[in-house]
Amino acid sequence: MPLNKEMAQLPVQFAVVDLFAGPGGLAEGFSAVSDANGHHPFKVVLSVEKEKAAHSTLLLRTFLRQFAGKFPDEYYAFLKRGAPEPDWAVLYPDQWNQANQDAQLLELGQDAADKLLVGKIDQIRKLYGNNTIVIGGPPCQAYSLVGRARNRGIVGYIPEEDPKHFLYKNYIDILTRLRPAAFIMENVKGMLSSSINDGLIFKKVLSDLRSAGDGYRLVSLTPRVRPQADLLEPTLLPTDFVIRSEDFGLPQARHRVIVVGIRKDVLDKPIAVRLDQLIPRCNMKATVADVLRGMPKLRSGLSREDSIANWGNAVKNAAAIVCKAVSVLPHDERDIFRARVNECAAVATTNPHPLSRAALKPAKAGSSCSESLKKWLLDPNLGVLPNNETRGHMASDLSRYLFAAVYGELVKVSPKASDFPKSLAPEHLNWNSGKFADRFRVQLWDQPSTTITSHISKDGHYFIHPDPEQCRSLTVREAARLQTFPDNYYFKGNRTEQFVQVGNAVPPFLAKQIGDALYALLQLRPNEPKGASGAVRAPHMPRPVIPHINSEAPVGQSSQKAKRKRGRRSERNPSLR
């Protein structure tokens, strides 16, 4: 029949399963991938998250994605007025019910959750065949340098008995059962050096990823910085999986491990292309100014007795403390520093239009922001920016915030602990130990920000706003912009929970680029994967013209130089096999 002939020429639409989804950063990026005709080849059909606040954010965004970018008017009214959230189940019952099916509040590894997931995974495989993608990153607390340092301080802590070290096996179990065409696994850079039983955990992770299901070839998104003589040899090093977000046009120096796996029968031979070459390289790095300039100027709050007048007096007092403290500087530097500090105090106390703590008007991007990033972030339908209220600070910290911000503005670097005058040192026993030299760190206008992490939920000392006149730490929305979440992405929960969600997420703008590259790579398949006859197909997307793959060869082929001893294959959850 003509219809069948036409359908046979159409490329496959891939069903995406998002594990450890958080607020949905990876899913947001993959959902935005489209061809020249506006067709979206990736459809997120299942997201799994265990934290209630993050799941609430994920559920709302899953609901909104069903409106194909044209969100309901009620949503914008909700964001603008700050009124109670509409009852979506009443207004849009079909879309809300579907969202509740797609976004699941579950903890992987729990019997009840695994039983439910088995049924859903089998349904997805039945409908889409092998044309599925798995994305996500197991929680990183056990692998991060900060988390490991914290664990070492716990009496009786035994890494081998910490289940957080083995959460990645839940991911492996899903791969084994679903056998997706490809997967994306994300984690912190500290995973490369984390060890269990005197063995590097990352070696075990890579081994398990390669052998999951029907077997996978692992590929790297990073440019080659050393020669690779034979593409048939698995010569990738662990560091080849580290992605520097600033190299992909993000306004943040975020370095994360991202492993891309392609099922071996999908690309059964190495091909003449590197996956990183499918992502356009950025000639200019995005900066803090690109995304924070153009946002409303806000004042910080005070943790006690906050008011506009009290805040102005607190900044005035902080300025006096800083001016006295910098008397140790050389004469010329001291005068310039004091002049700028006094300007900030004047803004706080004599401004005819006092700063508020929340944004009450739309926001723009910096004039130097790239058009692609600007288009990604901004939404002309927004009346105000959501999640953009400042937090309260101790009055005693304002002098340190003011010093750090003025220092960064004038010296173009963030001050270390040793750069602070002694009179500004906080009452921390470890202040002079050297372990926390960046305890008070200001972000710099003309540089990518430092890594936005969940620690921003604890205090704002490490994320001081670069404008000293605002004398504060970043808001949730400012952190979200540095993480490249669109302005219309609403984070639910209290402010601490919102910060945690933003800090733990994969930047959506980076996820979108990874999705673009992965889809282009999947178009190089010589034939449709076996078992995909029942897969859903999508409108035609032209195959890209691509010049050479930074890939590993099939498991079992290795050079003498690249050979590594592999650990024992661990027992996996049998319910997900």
Predicted features along the sequence, with ranges:
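Core alpha/beta nucleotide-donor-binding catalytic domains of modification enzymes
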Residues: 3-15, 21, 25-178, 189-203, ...
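C-terminal target-recognition/interaction regions appended to catalytic cores
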Residues: 14, 308-577
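Class I S-adenosyl-L-methionine
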Residues: 124-125, 145-422
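Short, flexible loop/turn segments with low-complexity composition
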Residues: 70-79, 219-225, 525-544
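Short, flexible loop/turn elements at secondary-structure junctions
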Residues: 20-23, 52, 138-140, 189, ...
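Generic recognition of flexible, low-complexity loop/linker segments
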Residues: 4-6, 245-247, 436-441
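Short acidic (Asp/Glu) and glycine-rich catalytic loops that position anionic groups and cofactors
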Residues: 38, 272, 458-462
